[in-house]
């Protein structure tokens, strides 16, 4: 099996009973798909860590090389790609803690490193180049993102799309008005288009498998229906803009009239 197949299976089992969120306390909860992915990937990462520890003991080494991946959170970017002793993995990388190495949502792992035999996968020069590259920002819709910020934005968009898919399906199951169902489906397609454009602009691979964990099948409307909906939305937006402009003009005219009357009153008082 692969990670995505396992996540889809577990999410399907949990949501089949009607479960939609997982509460971690009175003030914090996550959607089922978010909680499942975090739990499974974190657990598999920790299992890999235990295997690396066993291999390190067998090889007689206390040093390990942490792997590197793009878009690492800032706290992890400082130590990824480097060689550390096991104690340093704990003290510097936070091994064994939630926010540290192999903690919540951490995608890093580490492998035994034998001094004098092993060759580093990531040189300091290469790491320095990547650090500068990852810090570069790209503008989208008036906001700038570095690599980490862009990946976080991707995750937010994926979560929002899963929620929209669920909304569309629940409206259908609840036999809501056809227009409401269509509107929900078209909004989902619009979000998908935005996700595609954002990913292309940021030069990040799309991870649509994260969107389809729900196993809900096709939610997007036909191309013809979507284009018709887009035209309707554009027309509504144009009408709203025109109404807003008319309101602004009216307010401006009313203010001008008040100013004119105030000037006339002031002139009469000085006669």
Range-by-range predicted roles:
Residues 95-114:
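C-terminal edge-of-domain segments
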Residues 1-98, 116-271:
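Domain-core detector
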């Amino acid at each position: 099996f692969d990670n995505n197949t396992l996540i889809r299976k577990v999410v399907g089992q949990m949501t089949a009973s009607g479960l939609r969120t997982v509460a971690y306390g009175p003030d914090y909860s996550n959607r089922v798909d978010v909680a499942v992915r975090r739990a499974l990937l974190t657990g598999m990462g920790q299992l890999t860590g235990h295997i690396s520890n066993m291999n390190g003991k067998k090889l007689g080494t206390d040093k390990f090389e942490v792997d590197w991946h793009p878009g690492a959170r800032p706290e992890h970017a400082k130590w990824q790609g480097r060689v550390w002793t096991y104690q340093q993995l704990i003290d510097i990388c936070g091994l064994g803690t939630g926010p540290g190495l192999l903690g919540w949502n951490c995608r890093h792992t580490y492998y035994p490193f034998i001094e004098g035999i092993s060759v580093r996968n990531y040189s300091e020069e290469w790491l320095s180049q990547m650090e500068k590259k990852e810090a570069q920002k790209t503008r989208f819709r008036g906001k700038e993102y570095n690599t980490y910020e862009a990946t976080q934005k991707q995750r937010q968009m994926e979560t929002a799309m899963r929620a929209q898919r669920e909304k569309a399906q629940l409206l259908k199951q609840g036999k809501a008005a056809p227009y409401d169902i269509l509107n929900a489906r078209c909004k989902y397609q619009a979000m998908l288009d935005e996700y595609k454009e954002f990913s292309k602009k940021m030069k990040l691979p799309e991870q649509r498998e994260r969107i389809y964990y729900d196993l809900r099948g096709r939610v997007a409307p036909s191309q013809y229906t979507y284009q018709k909906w887009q035209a309707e939305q554009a027309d509504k937006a144009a009408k709203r803009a025109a109404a807003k402009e008319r309101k602004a003009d009216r307010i401006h005219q009313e203010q001008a009239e008040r100013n004119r009357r105030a000037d006339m009153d002031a002139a009469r008082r000085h006669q």
